[in-house]
């Protein structure tokens, strides 16, 4: 959502009239960020993950049906909406069914190649490519030159013109002094998010290190060393990421773009079973020397090593 909102802000600054279509779980974010814009809360939840682990072939088949069902809902709503509304541009943030043949349609995504075993992903990738080819343009929020932030995920065989527009982040680097504290950025669905928060806080408290928790959680241990902030807007998160000496977070692509922008290493802990996060965490560990840890095997040693290492990061 944060990368999409960055492009929305750019469109508004250029003098364009913008309307937003989103799902219910995105409504609060967009209404807070853009209170004066028309917002259509009509789209399906876009949070479908390709999971690793046992029964992979069955899971992949199920995901193909889920993807296609979502894309059909997006396409049908848009087609009906355009019967009584006119637009010059349709800009889709990672929604592969949100396009129309009569309106110039642009897709914003870093994921043009699905992560995971190529042979098993042959059919899902063919389905994805078919939808990619229905857009007029693709914008990739990454650098054009190597090393890319998205690794192999942004490689494509699509016929559509793809342009690397650079990372999109609302969090900019500043020269504020850092505080000795660990910022834990929470994301993802419950109950996994609260279990993740509880494990991280417990391990950090064993080292006597101050911790700030950004994001909602139901089971954070109480301590004078723990500061719970709940939901943070982009301005608050910008300040926290710049001033915190250390950061622990998931390896979602939007978060990685923000880390690249502020030039700070974080301890990356991908959500267990989510191929894309696992793929990105491994790539950033190998390419950029970021520390990583397994969600199911978090240990004090992971934090000792990270807290004693430099957090300065330069892409090259």
Where are these regions (language model features)?
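Donor-nucleotide binding loops and adjacent catalytic segments primarily
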Residues: 8, 163-246, 296
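Conserved nucleotide-sugar phosphate-binding/catalytic loop shared by glycosyltransferases and other
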Residues: 10-64
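Short, polar loop motifs at secondary-structure junctions
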Residues: 23-28, 90-97, 144-146, 211-221
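Conserved nucleotide-sugar donor-binding subdomain of glycosyltransferases
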Residues: 56-97
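Alpha-helix C-terminal capping/helix-to-coil transition sites in glycosyltransferase folds
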Residues: 84-86, 133-134, 181, 242-243
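Nucleotide-sugar donor-binding patch of glycosyltransferase catalytic domains
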Residues: 231, 261-309
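A donor-sugar binding/catalytic signature common to diverse glycosyltransferases
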Residues: 236-279
């Amino acid at each position: 959502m944060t990368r999409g909102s960055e492009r929305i802000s750019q469109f508004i600054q250029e003098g364009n009239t913008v309307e937003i279509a989103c799902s219910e779980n995105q409504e609060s974010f967009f209404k807070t960020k853009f209170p004066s814009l028309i917002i259509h809360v009509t789209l399906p939840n876009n949070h479908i993950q390709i999971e690793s682990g046992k029964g992979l072939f069955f899971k992949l088949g199920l995901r193909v049906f889920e993807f296609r069902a979502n894309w059909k809902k997006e396409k049908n709503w848009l087609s009906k909406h355009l019967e009584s509304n006119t637009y010059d541009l349709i800009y889709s943030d990672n929604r592969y069914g949100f396009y129309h043949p009569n309106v110039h349609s642009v897709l914003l995504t870093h994921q043009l190649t699905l992560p995971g075993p190529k042979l098993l992903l042959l059919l899902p990738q063919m389905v994805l490519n078919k939808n990619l080819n229905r857009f007029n343009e693709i914008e990739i929020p990454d650098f054009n030159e190597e090393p890319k932030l998205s690794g192999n995920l942004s490689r494509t065989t699509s016929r559509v013109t793809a342009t690397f527009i650079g990372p999109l982040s609302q969090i900019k680097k500043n020269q504020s002094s850092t505080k000795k504290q660990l910022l834990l950025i929470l994301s993802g669905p419950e109950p996994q998010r609260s279990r993740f928060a509880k494990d991280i806080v417990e391990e950090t408290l064993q080292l006597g290190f101050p911790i700030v928790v950004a994001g909602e959680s139901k089971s954070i241990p109480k301590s004078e060393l723990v500061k719970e902030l709940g939901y943070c807007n982009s301005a608050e998160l910008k300040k926290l990421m710049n001033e915190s000496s250390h950061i622990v977070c998931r390896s979602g692509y939007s978060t990685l773009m923000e880390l690249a922008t502020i030039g700070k290493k974080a301890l990356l802990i991908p959500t267990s079973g989510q191929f894309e996060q696992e793929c990105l965490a491994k790539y950033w560990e190998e390419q950029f020397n970021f520390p990583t840890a397994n969600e199911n095997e978090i240990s004090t040693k992971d934090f000792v090593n990270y807290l004693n290492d430099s957090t300065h990061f330069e892409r090259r």
